[in-house]
A protein has these predicted regions:
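Conserved core segment of the aminotransferase class I/II
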Residues: 51-126
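Conserved PLP-binding catalytic core of the aspartate aminotransferase-like
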Residues: 124-177
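Short, electropositive alpha-helical surface patch
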Residues: 14-16, 43-56
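Active-site-proximal structural scaffolding
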Residues: 8, 19, 39-42, 52, ...
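Alpha-helical subdomain
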Residues: 5, 34-43, 95-102
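Active-site phosphate-binding strand-loop segment of PLP-dependent enzymes
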Residues: 1-35
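Amphipathic alpha-helical segments in well-structured domains
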Residues: 12, 42-46, 90, 140
């Protein structure tokens, strides 16, 4: 999320309730899973939607978390109510896919699949991802320290409380020019 502000589990529960009450179909974008609090923690929202017995889409990108930017590696998962519905959805997805591309590149997908299905490689990848996550946190702390040194007044803790690669700074133009 480009603001760095993630919903709390309580806020997600409210979103789930609205989706359920209104009969909506949610689309969850997991482009930065693992950069916030960890792979499982960042993906916990999926469990909330599953527990509510909802139908929804999950778009997962591996371009950032695997540093495969040029490969554009990702997946679309669709949670359906039963196998008949899944078959109908798959049929429609195949039509959409066929009109967009016939043979997508496979190198990046093979790299991701190999890492995720090889326990030693997966553990190493998760360790590296944790290192990236900690570096982002350290950079946020350094930014706040530099802003304080530059004389920026006011509350800045929200910058270190935000997660991931993006941050909504809330700084004015004058503060940015310091």
């Amino acid at each position: 999320n480009p603001t760095g502000c993630d919903l709390t589990p309580t806020q997600w529960a409210q979103v789930v309730q609205v989706v359920k009450t209104r009969g909506l179909v949610a689309f969850l974008d997991m482009a930065y899973q693992g950069f916030g609090d960890g792979i499982a923690q960042d993906g916990a929202v999926i469990g909330q939607f599953l527990a509510a017995d909802l139908r929804f889409f999950v778009s997962t990108s591996f371009s950032k978390s695997f540093s495969l930017y040029g490969e554009r590696v990702g997946a679309l998962s669709v949670v359906c109510g039963d196998s008949d519905e899944a078959a109908r959805v798959l049929s429609q997805l195949k039509i959409v896919i066929r009109t967009n591309y016939s043979n997508p590149p496979t190198f990046g997908a093979q790299v991701v699949a190999t890492v995720l299905t090889t326990p030693g490689l997966r553990a190493l990848w998760e360790q590296d991802l944790g290192g990236m996550r900690e570096r982002i946190r350290a950079m946020r702390q350094a930014l706040v320290a530099k802003l304080r040194t530059a004389g920026v007044q006011g509350e800045l803790d929200y910058i270190t409380e935000q997660k991931g690669m993006f941050s909504y700074s809330g700084l004015s133009k004058a503060q940015m020019l310091r």
